[in-house]
């Protein structure tokens, strides 16, 4: 039995004394101990070494005290497993030297044996579960097929992912073939994560908000829906789409246990659009963690009041920024823990 099961209760829609809290990218660069490991090991070495991934995953639990751990990894380990070369370049971010920018290249993309290619992730989950000793739940995650396609086609990060969009609109058959391959791999990957011991999973659709609503349904949501459908009876699924407030009504009917919202969508609008029955997660602006700790506390209180303490998970609206002071991150977590109605 997990000692602190606030997150799992919130995902089931049960009443809680206060909302659970965790932060996207909480095992990250704002932690000085993380930076020490970053100096010694490159990014994918940290992802692929179960001992390091475990150490990094547990770091924020010990240092800032959130109610859940999220496995240290990256959404781009999935395309790596699919025989697509992915590097992490300092100062650039993800770099794919051979983008999947033609129908012929899509044919060469494989649907792998996830145990063979991603066994190190499942090993890290088992090790992390042991290290956590049932203190808090462990969340596993994957990128949405659309978000992964964005990197695979664009070849790197982008504000517009114009090449990815062009590819989908000019080669829709090839685009859907690639999206289905990513979806099939992601389902197998997440099912193995569940077997290894994760207590919940989150789908990150970081770039869904770049699509207009009709294209979002076609190129993103229908693949996320497949993943939710395949997983929902085994584990609670959190569906997060940055800038995807326009799809909250459809997302709420998907079988997901919770929906993540960003800071551009007010709590009352998110509740209204999602029908008021589903658990919501979010939506503190990550840049607001630059504010003074006392201001963070007031803003967190306002956020919880706006969402209501039940069917709610306090989180940021996207990942924590790299140079946020640790004390401010802790002030965010503490403010949720100290919340009283």
From Swiss-Prot:
Annotated positions for site Transition state stabilizer: 74
Keyword field? Cytoplasm, Decarboxylase, Lyase, Porphyrin biosynthesis
Q: What is its main location?
A: cytoplasm
> What pathway is it annotated to?
Porphyrin-containing compound metabolism; protoporphyrin-IX biosynthesis; coproporphyrinogen-III from 5-aminolevulinate: step 4/4
Q: Which GO terms describe its cellular component?
A: cytosol
Gene Ontology terms, MF aspect: uroporphyrinogen decarboxylase activity
Q: Which residues form a coiled coil?
A: none
Task: Name the Enzyme Commission number(s) assigned to this protein.
Answer: 4.1.1.37
- Binding of substrate occurs at 25-29, 44, 74, 151, 206, 318
Checking Pfam families in the record gives:
URO-D (PF01208)
* KW Protease (keyword) present: no
- Per its UniProt record, what InterPro entries does this chain match? UROD/MetE-like_sf, Uroporphyrinogen_deCO2ase_HemE, Uroporphyrinogen_deCOase
User: Where does it live in the cell?
Assistant: Cytoplasm
**Catalytic reaction equation(s):** uroporphyrinogen III + 4 H(+) = coproporphyrinogen III + 4 CO2
Extract one GO BP annotation from the record. Answer: protoporphyrinogen IX biosynthetic process
What the entry lists under NCBIfam families is as follows: hemE
Description of how the protein assembles with itself and partners: Homodimer.
Q: Family assignment?
A: Belongs to the uroporphyrinogen decarboxylase family.
Q: What does this protein do?
A: Catalyzes the decarboxylation of four acetate groups of uroporphyrinogen-III to yield coproporphyrinogen-III.
Would you tell me the protein name for this molecule?
Uroporphyrinogen decarboxylase
Question: What is the originating organism of this protein?
Answer: Christiangramia forsetii (strain DSM 17595 / CGMCC 1.15422 / KT0803) (Gramella forsetii)
**What's the gene?**
hemE
